A protein has these predicted regions:
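Solvent-exposed edge beta-strands and adjacent loop segments
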Residues: 1-24, 93-149, 182-205, 214
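Extended beta-strand solenoid/passenger and fiber regions
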Residues: 1-67, 72-87, 96-103
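Extracellular Ig-like/FN3 beta-sandwich strand-entry sites
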Residues: 86-90, 139, 164-166
Length: 228
């Protein structure tokens, strides 16, 4: 893989509140009749009701279904079994709420760290006297440095703490080609630095909440949207 200039990166976040869907949104079949991706909006609000429907032809006979898993941060529907062509292979979301994202202006650097946690489960007489460890959970934290002084993330922090909301984050390393990390997160800290002979700066720290995705294209498919 060739080097990528850091200038190609970016940071995007959602803002509260989410927006209720005004009309049904179609979903694109990945080709296996199991994985479908929402056609227009990527990030959906997990605190709001979502209704998924199937149709035999995409225009009539829409019926609400519940035999699926929905991956909210990327708008992916995964059905328990493949849809049948001519019976129920057209899919749409008839009710739900989505997040609107925009660039965190002034952002100039981001740094993330993924960790896997383990638990020592070494028994007596362990082979070779080696410790035995069990993988438990994964976590991700990240920070963003900005040339900005405003309350955008501070407001989101207040909203999430009071109402139990969430923020959708995109950490791009190659925005032009759609390459980024995408996930829900909660802000954990905000610091500001004002120096007379420098520019105003703001640093933001956040913690991922739920699955983290690597996305390698703006065209979503089972090969370009990867859950870590």
């Amino acid at each position: 893989m060739s080097a990528i200039a850091g200038i190609n990166g970016d940071v995007w976040t959602s803002t509260s509140p989410s927006t209720a869907l005004g009309s049904s949104e179609s979903c694109t079949d990945s080709g296996n009749h199991i994985n479908y991706f929402t056609a227009t909006h990527q990030a959906w609000d997990p605190t709001q009701t979502l209704t998924v429907q199937n149709s035999p032809n995409g225009s009539t006979g829409w019926a609400t279904v519940t035999d699926y898993v929905f991956y909210w941060p990327v708008g992916e529907i995964v059905f328990n079994t493949a849809r049948s062509v001519g019976t129920n292979n057209f899919t749409r979301i008839s009710a739900g709420s989505y997040f609107t994202l925009s660039a965190l202006d002034g952002a100039h650097a981001w740094k993330m760290s993924v960790k896997g946690m383990t638990k020592d489960v070494t028994p007596f007489q362990a082979s070779g006297s080696w410790a035995v460890n069990l993988a438990t959970i994964k976590s991700m934290t990240f920070s963003v440095d900005c040339f900005r002084q405003d309350g955008r993330i501070l407001t989101e922090m207040g909203t999430t703490n009071i109402s139990g909301g969430i923020i959708l984050c995109q950490l791009w390393w190659d925005e032009a080609n759609g390459k980024r990390w995408q996930f829900y997160a909660l802000p954990t800290g905000i610091s500001q630095n004002i120096v007379a002979n420098d520019v105003d700066k703001q640093s933001i720290n956040m913690q991922a909440s739920g699955p983290v995705y690597i996305i390698t294209s703006n065209t979503f498919s089972t090969t370009t949207v990867i859950q870590e």
